[in-house]
Amino acid sequence: MSQQEVCPLNLFQSAQGTGRVCMRVCVCERGRELAVLYRAAMGNAQKKGPGYREGGGPNSQPGTPGRRRSHGLNNAANSKEVPGSSPAANGSLPAGKSQDEPQGPGSAGESCNLDAPCGALPPPLARLKNQGNMLFKNGQFGDALEKYTQAIDGCIEAGIDSPEDLCVLYSNRAACFLKDGNSADCIQDCTRALELHPFSLKPLLRRAMAYESLERYRKAYVDYKTVLQIDISVQAAHDSVHRITKMLIEQDGPDWREKLPEIPAVPLSAQQHRKEEPSAELLQARAERAEQEKARKAEARFTILKQEGNELVKNSQFQGASEKYSECLAIKPNECAIYTNRALCFLKLERFAEAKQDCDSALQMEPKNKKAFYRRALAHKGLKDYLSASTDLQEVLQLDPNVQEAEQELEMVTNLLRESLLANAQG
């Protein structure tokens, strides 16, 4: 391979210190790695859109009879199957294998019916196409290219009006060119295939890879983005867009998008994996499930916070406990017990006004809550409102006469109230 030729399959690895993509790697040294990358990239484009065999559309322009035969990677020895690699090396279908597309190398043991019909092609041309597929499958890319070229030339010379079959032939030959490192001819054949069948995924993906190998990053970016409009699940296109974006930012600066060619809008009819609009019932069911899941998570979080707060109270860490209870109330603002728990923390921290406020909130929810009355009485006591404290303690004893703490506090508060009244009278 001369230095002017582009490496048939690119490692797409950044060169040290340059940020540039290394596009020329010797096949004899890195053949295995290159083959793995190509299979990984093309193996993602496995499905065709409904109702076509990568064909359709207007007739193409005349081909190029007498196209030279390529001799880069034209035999199985130069393209050995890599263990564990995808069988869809060129983007062929792994299931329901079609003879419209060549299968990846490494499956030579499979039988191939060379006389199988191929669309509207007459038997001699169908046989050429099937032979090309078999040769490609065996890794003989140069020989496969010659068969596809003969089939293309035969279609043109015979005036066969079968754009579907001609599109696939161009796409298959483009796969050979890409395998053989001939990126320029790959681009040319992919463009012809796309003229026959616009927005055909495999020619777009192959052309994008060829553009990238030639460091024509803007055009590669456009083709990869078009591929993702057709089929969002093509991971190779996602990876390539991410990689090329970095290259374009380095090459063109922050305004790199303004220098891109226009990205075509793919019609809905050409898009794969499109999701149907969900029904109103389905949307409602989803919303209900989401709400239930949200409530479940909130309840679990509430329980954890409450337990953490209780543990902190046991360890006399009242500031931390009050914060945990505050988080609880953010989740469930109508939980009476949390207000009384936080009121206890505020009492210990001598934040009497806040303690009283929490007890007020608790009593609004539970008007006969003994803890709320008792702790509010202590808050009143801390605020030196002995009369209100006495009133709340009497409420506690009316609800439960056996609360000894309330009796003791009532006696203490009564004495404080008496002393306060005497002091005021003397003053």
Swiss-Prot record:
It is found in: Cytoplasm; Dynein axonemal particle. Keywords: Cytoplasm, Repeat, TPR repeat. Gene3D superfamilies: Tetratricopeptide repeat domain. GO terms for cellular component: cytoplasm; cytosol; dynein axonemal particle. SMART domains: TPR. PROSITE patterns: TPR, TPR_REGION. Its main location: cytoplasm. TPR repeats lie at residues 125-158, 167-200, 202-234, 302-335, 336-369, 371-403. Residues 46-113 are annotated as: Disordered. InterPro entries: CiliaryAsmbly_MitoImport, TPR-like_helical_dom_sf, TPR_rpt. One of its GO terms (biological process) is axonemal dynein complex assembly. Disruption phenotype: Morpholino knockdown of the protein causes increase incidence of dorsal curvature and hydrocephalus. May play a role in the cytoplasmic assembly and/or trafficking of the axonemal dynein arms. PANTHER family: RNA (RNA) POLYMERASE II ASSOCIATED PROTEIN HOMOLOG, SPERM-ASSOCIATED ANTIGEN 1. This is Sperm-associated antigen 1A. It comes from Danio rerio. The gene is spag1a.
